[in-house]
Amino acid sequence: MDIIPYASAIGSIMDAMLCTRPDIAHALSVTSRYQADPGLEHWKAVKCILKYLRRTKDLLLVYGGNSLKVEGYTDSSFQSDVDDSKSNSGYVYTLNGGAVCWKSSKQDTTTDSTTEAEYIAASDAAKEGVWLKKFITDLGVVPDSEEPISLYCDNNGVIAQAKEPRSHQKSKHVLRRFHLIREIVTRGDVAVERVPSEDNIADPLTKSLSHIVFERHKGLMGIKHIGDWL
C-alpha cells in the first residue's frame, strides 16, 4: 500500500465535501481515519467515493426555499466504529432550502446509550449554532436573526436533558463539557426541538442508509441535479 496515493485522494475528496457535498461527509469521515495505515479494503472504499463523485458531478447545492431561516439537524449513530465502538456525530444547518454548514465526525468518548451519543452530537451541533447565529446577526440580512435557531433532534431524552438546568442521575456520567448545550439553550441561542426520525436530514452524516432514504435526505439538504434546476 506504500505506492497508493491514499492521503492525496482523501485530501481531494475533502475539498469537494467542504465546498458543496455534504452527502459524502460520512464516507469521508470513516475512510480518513485510516490514513496512517490504510488497507486494501480502505482503498476500495476511497475509490468508491471517487466513482460516486464522478457519477454525480452534475450535482450542486441550491438555495431557493420559501423562507430565509436557519434550521439545524443533529443525529448520531451508536457504537458504530468497528475498531473502538465509538459513535459518529453529524449535524447540518440549512438556510433558504440549502445546507450552509455540516459535519460528520467520530466522537472522542465511548457512550453506553443512544441518548448519550445523541446528546454529545447535539452539544457539538449547538456550539456551531452559536457561531452561526452570531454570523447571520452581524450580516443583518436574515429576518428574525435574534430568535433562537431551531436545532432538530429525533431523541426525546436529548431534548429533555438539553433543557435541564442541573445534571441528574441519568446524565451524571456524561462529561461536563457536553452540558454546555444547556447554557446555550437557556441563553436563547438555540432551541432543541423534536423531529421524526424519517425527517432528520442529519441521518446521512452518521450512518449508511438505503438508496431511497439517502436520495430523499440529499434532496432536503438542497443537493440537486443541475438539469432539474436550470
Language model feature labels by segment:
Residues 13, 73-115:
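RNase H-like nuclease fold core
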Residues 55-59, 79, 99-101, 135-141:
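Conserved helix-loop functional segments at active or binding sites
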Residues 51-74, 144-145:
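Structured nucleic-acid-interacting core domains from mobile-element enzymes and related host factors
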Residues 3-25, 77-80, 88, 115-131:
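Conserved pre-motif C helix in the palm subdomain of viral-like polymerases
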Residues 16-19, 52, 94-96, 124, ...:
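Conserved catalytic core of Hanks-type protein kinase domains
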Residues 1-59, 196, 204:
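C-terminal reverse transcriptase regions that engage the nucleic-acid substrate
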Residues 34, 67-69, 87, 105-230:
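RNase H-like nuclease module associated with reverse transcription
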Residues 58-60, 69-71, 90-92, 98-99, ...:
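Conserved active-site beta-strand-loop modules that form the wall/rim of enzyme catalytic pockets
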